[in-house]
Amino acid sequence: VRNVTATLQAEIETMLVADLAGRLTADIRPQIYLSVNVLAEQNGRTEQGTSGGGARCGIEHFTRERVEAWCEKAVREAVLQTEARPAPSGVMPVVLGPGWPGILLHEAVGHGLEADAHRKETSVFTGCIGQRVAPKGVTIVDDGSLPGRRGSLTVDDEGTPTQRTVLI
């Protein structure tokens, strides 16, 4: 291991929404994230391993065991990469699990599902409600109500309680 960098980010957002009916909705949104980046050098190759995690909670999320596991994972990944062969190229099936792939889906598909894009009619999905826009077997769900998860909230930015919503 040649170099280790750890980055801790923490924020607390306080929001208050007033609607036209005079209803006030408030929320406090803590968010914390720790990233561990390791550079390993072996046989003339320098490779990187990254691990970490976060949640909508406070510093208590980072137990000694959890942080050590992230560090070990980053080291393992960096060292393993120094021995890795090039990945095959070409078209192949991809399976995405829960968690971070949600960011990829959000960037690739999610922005086109946001209300402002539909209001401006700039989304590829404009006018597609009720139509199939993905192959059978593909389901994309937005669930902002999962406790403690980075994308979870008590209420959205309009003051509406979050829920599980099937997008596609």
What are these regions (language model features)?
Residues 1-153, 160-161:
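Active-site bordering "gate/hinge" segments
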Residues 157-168:
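Long, well-ordered mid-to-C-terminal structural blocks that present hydrophobic/aromatic surfaces
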